[in-house]
Regions:
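Thr-Gly-centered strand-to-loop micro-motif
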Residues: 153-155
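Short acidic/histidine-rich active-site segments
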Residues: 157-159
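Alpha/beta enzyme core
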Residues: 3-19, 28-150, 161-170
Length: 170
């Protein structure tokens, strides 16, 4: 469980005489209850992934997690848009372009949920790439222009270094 993971990390840090701060992040959690359990166990940040839900349901779930987490000083990442591909037991299929994050929705999502950072879809995917990825830098620029929180890109493994560097610059 979450407590066991936190305990293992703390023991490893102590054994290594770790001198730097360590963050323990719960990635791609799909339920409010699991986010609460992770926060109570000692995680320092959580990602609530309601990206498979309709927009209004994603907003409601993400806001609920952010409201709870912020009471404990915990950082929350929300996700809007879908990354095609596979991650763990989850598989998302479809047209990568239509699954990308809409900048106007991103702005509304951030404002309504109170998240600390937003994971967006601009052409990356989870799992192994069948064809070379192409990041939609113009879409990223538009999102960056309208949100006031850090932007997170998931599914970057296999993305050419030049595209990652261009995304960072924009």
């Amino acid at each position: 469980g979450f407590e066991g993971t936190v305990d293992t990390v703390k023991r490893a840090m102590k054994a290594a005489d770790c001198k730097v701060p360590v963050a323990l992040h719960l990635d791609h959690c799909r339920t409010y209850e699991e986010c609460v359990q992770a926060i109570q166990a000692g995680y320092s940040s959580v990602m609530i992934d309601g990206s498979s839900l309709p927009f209004e349901e994603n907003v409601a779930l993400t806001k609920k997690v952010a409201d709870y987490a912020h009471c404990y000083g915990i950082t929350v990442e929300g996700e809007l848009g879908k990354l095609v591909g596979e991650e763990g037991n989850f598989k998302v299929e479809g047209d990568p372009e239509s699954a990308q994050t809409d900048p106007d929705q991103a702005k509304e999502f951030v404002e309504r949920t109170g998240i600390d950072c937003i994971a967006v879809s601009i052409g990356t995917q989870h799992g192994v790439y069948v064809a070379a990825p192409h990041l939609n830098i113009e879409r990223l620029k538009k999102i960056h222009d309208v949100v006031d929180v850090p932007i997170v890109l998931h599914g970057g493994s296999g993305t050419p270094k030049e595209q990652v560097q261009e995304a960072i610059r924009n």
